[in-house]
Amino acid sequence: MTQVAVVNVQPTKNFMEVAFNLIQYKEVKQGNIGLDKLYELVGCDSKMIERVTLGELPNGNYLDLIIDEEGTFGQWNRGIHIKNANNDKITVLGNCVFVQSTIEGDWIGWNSEEKMADAIRPYTYKIKFFELAEKEA
Protein backbone atom coordinates (compact mmCIF):
# COMPACT_ATOMS: atom_id res chain seq x y z
CA MET A 1 0.00 0.00 0.00
CA THR A 2 1.37 3.43 -0.96
CA GLN A 3 0.52 6.41 1.25
CA VAL A 4 1.06 10.15 1.57
CA ALA A 5 0.76 12.45 4.59
CA VAL A 6 -2.09 14.96 4.36
CA VAL A 7 -2.40 17.94 6.70
CA ASN A 8 -6.15 18.34 7.18
CA VAL A 9 -7.24 21.46 9.09
CA GLN A 10 -10.89 20.25 9.19
CA PRO A 11 -12.72 23.61 9.40
CA THR A 12 -16.00 22.05 10.55
CA LYS A 13 -14.46 20.58 13.74
CA ASN A 14 -13.38 22.40 16.86
CA PHE A 15 -9.75 23.31 17.35
CA MET A 16 -8.94 20.60 19.91
CA GLU A 17 -10.51 17.79 17.83
CA VAL A 18 -8.35 18.75 14.87
CA ALA A 19 -5.09 18.86 16.83
CA PHE A 20 -5.20 15.11 17.53
CA ASN A 21 -5.85 14.17 13.90
CA LEU A 22 -4.06 16.97 12.04
CA ILE A 23 -1.79 14.76 9.93
CA GLN A 24 -3.57 11.87 8.24
CA TYR A 25 -2.10 9.08 6.17
CA LYS A 26 -4.01 8.56 2.92
CA GLU A 27 -3.69 5.66 0.50
CA VAL A 28 -2.65 6.36 -3.09
CA LYS A 29 -3.38 3.57 -5.53
CA GLN A 30 -0.68 2.75 -8.11
CA GLY A 31 1.90 4.81 -6.21
CA ASN A 32 2.10 7.78 -8.60
CA ILE A 33 0.18 10.85 -7.47
CA GLY A 34 -1.55 12.82 -10.19
CA LEU A 35 -3.10 16.25 -9.81
CA ASP A 36 -6.63 14.86 -9.64
CA LYS A 37 -5.66 12.70 -6.66
CA LEU A 38 -4.11 15.70 -4.90
CA TYR A 39 -7.27 17.75 -5.39
CA GLU A 40 -9.33 14.85 -4.07
CA LEU A 41 -7.11 14.41 -0.98
CA VAL A 42 -7.40 18.03 0.08
CA GLY A 43 -10.91 18.82 -1.17
CA CYS A 44 -9.74 21.56 -3.55
CA ASP A 45 -11.66 23.00 -6.49
CA SER A 46 -9.21 25.75 -7.53
CA LYS A 47 -6.92 23.47 -9.61
CA MET A 48 -3.88 25.71 -9.11
CA ILE A 49 -1.10 24.28 -6.98
CA GLU A 50 2.39 25.18 -5.88
CA ARG A 51 5.24 22.94 -4.83
CA VAL A 52 7.52 23.85 -1.93
CA THR A 53 10.65 21.69 -1.87
CA LEU A 54 11.66 21.10 1.73
CA GLY A 55 14.84 19.15 1.06
CA GLU A 56 16.55 16.06 -0.31
CA LEU A 57 15.69 12.63 1.10
CA PRO A 58 18.25 9.87 1.77
CA ASN A 59 16.88 7.88 -1.21
CA GLY A 60 17.75 10.69 -3.68
CA ASN A 61 14.17 11.95 -4.02
CA TYR A 62 13.00 15.30 -2.67
CA LEU A 63 10.39 16.01 -0.02
CA ASP A 64 7.79 18.37 -1.45
CA LEU A 65 4.94 20.11 0.31
CA ILE A 66 2.05 20.62 -2.13
CA ILE A 67 -0.24 23.59 -1.49
CA ASP A 68 -2.62 25.48 -3.71
CA GLU A 69 -1.30 28.60 -5.44
CA GLU A 70 -2.94 30.82 -2.85
CA GLY A 71 -1.79 28.58 -0.01
CA THR A 72 -5.29 27.70 1.13
CA PHE A 73 -6.81 24.63 -0.56
CA GLY A 74 -10.09 26.41 0.16
CA GLN A 75 -9.50 26.93 3.89
CA TRP A 76 -8.76 30.51 4.87
CA ASN A 77 -8.99 30.44 8.67
CA ARG A 78 -6.65 27.61 9.78
CA GLY A 79 -3.15 26.53 8.99
CA ILE A 80 0.21 25.31 10.21
CA HIS A 81 3.64 26.74 10.93
CA ILE A 82 6.42 24.27 10.08
CA LYS A 83 9.90 24.60 11.55
CA ASN A 84 12.66 22.23 10.48
CA ALA A 85 15.75 21.20 12.44
CA ASN A 86 17.63 24.22 10.96
CA ASN A 87 14.93 26.61 12.26
CA ASP A 88 13.68 27.44 8.74
CA LYS A 89 9.99 28.37 8.96
CA ILE A 90 7.11 27.91 6.51
CA THR A 91 3.53 29.04 7.12
CA VAL A 92 0.70 27.38 5.22
CA LEU A 93 -2.98 28.32 5.35
CA GLY A 94 -5.27 25.36 4.83
CA ASN A 95 -4.60 21.78 3.84
CA CYS A 96 -1.42 20.49 2.24
CA VAL A 97 0.18 17.19 1.22
CA PHE A 98 3.70 15.83 1.78
CA VAL A 99 4.97 13.80 -1.20
CA GLN A 100 8.24 12.51 -2.62
CA SER A 101 9.37 14.08 -5.87
CA THR A 102 11.51 11.91 -8.12
CA ILE A 103 14.30 13.25 -10.34
CA GLU A 104 11.93 12.68 -13.28
CA GLY A 105 9.39 15.00 -11.62
CA ASP A 106 6.84 12.38 -10.55
CA TRP A 107 5.14 12.71 -7.19
CA ILE A 108 5.07 9.43 -5.31
CA GLY A 109 4.13 8.22 -1.86
CA TRP A 110 5.72 5.81 0.59
CA ASN A 111 5.17 2.07 1.05
CA SER A 112 5.53 2.30 4.82
CA GLU A 113 4.15 4.77 7.37
CA GLU A 114 7.39 4.37 9.33
CA LYS A 115 9.55 5.31 6.31
CA MET A 116 7.23 8.21 5.53
CA ALA A 117 7.43 9.51 9.11
CA ASP A 118 11.23 9.12 9.10
CA ALA A 119 11.46 11.06 5.81
CA ILE A 120 9.21 13.89 6.97
CA ARG A 121 10.51 14.25 10.54
CA PRO A 122 13.75 16.23 9.82
CA TYR A 123 11.77 18.81 7.84
CA THR A 124 8.94 19.11 10.34
CA TYR A 125 10.82 19.37 13.61
CA LYS A 126 7.93 21.40 14.95
CA ILE A 127 4.42 21.81 13.54
CA LYS A 128 2.20 24.41 15.15
CA PHE A 129 -1.50 24.46 14.32
CA PHE A 130 -3.11 27.93 14.34
CA GLU A 131 -6.48 29.51 13.77
CA LEU A 132 -7.01 33.08 12.58
CA ALA A 133 -9.48 35.25 14.45
CA GLU A 134 -12.76 35.76 12.61
CA LYS A 135 -13.43 39.24 11.29
CA GLU A 136 -16.11 41.19 13.08
CA ALA A 137 -19.07 42.26 10.97
Where are these regions (language model features)?
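Short beta-rich binding modules
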Residues: 1-137
